[in-house]
Amino acid sequence: MKASHICSYLLSIAPLVVSHGVHHNRDHGHEANHESKQSFLILKQESIFYSLVCFLQNHLFVLGPRYNAIVAILIIQLMPCLFVLFVPGLRKNDRASLTLSLLVSFSLGTLLGDILLHVIPESLSGVTDVTMVGGAIFLGFISFLTLDKTMRILSGTSNDDGSIHSHSHSHTPQQTAEKKAGFNMSAYLNVISGIAHHITDGIALATSFYSSTQVGIMTSIAVTFHEIPHELGDFAILLSSGFTFPQAIRAQAVTAFGAVVGTSIGCWMNEIGNNSHKATSSSANASELMLPFTAGGLIYIATTSVVPQILHSSAPDSKLREFKKWALQLVFIFVGFAVMALMDEH
């Protein structure tokens, strides 16, 4: 079976899991269990997936839902970090390299795809007050803008991307120290946004394991396929923003901690009141608040960090070379968006 079919199939099941685990459990407790069983019956029709899920259930996810969820989120966060080690050109840390430029373009596609195809639609799912969702997105954007501006004022810098946008070669000792340290506001904002995003993912994943082990495993596989291109794009943003390879790895580890925190919160919410509706209601409320806020932060990062890097010309004297480079960048933007569309295909 082709990889694209595998991804499409897995992700066609996962949204159902997350949907009834995070957004609809408040009103459809018995319906959720039926949906869980139905999803696993569908899985049985594909012997490869049935065998894989049974193997994982018997050899890896052998404990209760709390521990299974923690194990799953650790594996999910480890996979993208291992994946970046095999991408050529990332260790060189050359901000002008074509590889990094194309990865930044890919990250813009995945970022926009995540915002437009996943985060915002998920925020609007089952919500009657659309204005509140829009307000939360706006609040997220303004919060990241305020944080960015505050950090710039406190650090005494007016443009953290000076090496990209400025033609001046004079630097104060403070600016030189910041450059050596890989100091970049947008990169840190990307880390903060990643933490918030991973918290919501962790809550959803934990809820799926409390639905059933099989559903939790299916969700874990689907989320892994989703996270690899997403984390690869985030990694490219960090490198292009001035982080060294080890710094980017450490930053990704910090965002991974957010997923563990989110999973722990999800487990706590599901266990409160002996699996009563109170747990799933709290989980849904937390997710409804976090998702649109995260969308606002992601929009800020895309518009102030990623897009300016793509607009930057590395060889302004060669117009033909720049047009060829832009053509490749445009292709990678579409590829990134298409990957996220495939990941979120219902």
From Swiss-Prot:
Lineage: superkingdom: Eukaryota
GO terms of biological process kind: intracellular zinc ion homeostasis; zinc ion transmembrane transport; zinc ion transport
Transmembrane segments: 3-23, 70-90, 100-120, 127-147, 203-223, 253-273, 291-311, 323-343
Positions of glycan attachment: 184, 274, 285
Entry keyword annotation includes Endoplasmic reticulum: yes
Topology, Cytoplasmic side: 24-69, 121-126, 224-252, 312-322
Primary location: endoplasmic reticulum
GO molecular function: zinc ion transmembrane transporter activity
Keywords: Endoplasmic reticulum, Glycoprotein, Ion transport, Membrane, Transmembrane, Transmembrane helix, Transport, Zinc, Zinc transport
Transmembrane among keywords: yes
Any one GO cellular component localisation term in the record: endoplasmic reticulum
Membrane topology: Multi-pass membrane protein
Leader sequence residues: none
Extracellular side: 1-2, 91-99, 148-202, 274-290, 344-346
Localization per record: Endoplasmic reticulum membrane
InterPro entries the record matches: ZIP
Role played: Zinc transporter whose role depends on the zinc status of the cells. It helps to balance zinc levels between the cytosol and the secretory pathway. It transports zinc into the secretory pathway in a zinc-adequate environment and in a high zinc medium. In high zinc medium, transport of zinc into the secretory pathway is a way to eliminate zinc from the cytosol. Under low cytosolic zinc conditions, it removes zinc from the secretory pathway and acts as a zinc importer that helps to alleviate ER stress.
PANTHER family: ZINC TRANSPORTER SLC39A7 HISTIDINE-RICH MEMBRANE PROTEIN KE4 (PTHR16950), ZINC TRANSPORTER ZIP13 (PTHR16950:SF16)
Protein family per UniProt: Belongs to the ZIP transporter (TC 2.A.5) family. KE4/Catsup subfamily.
Name of the protein in question: Zinc transporter YKE4
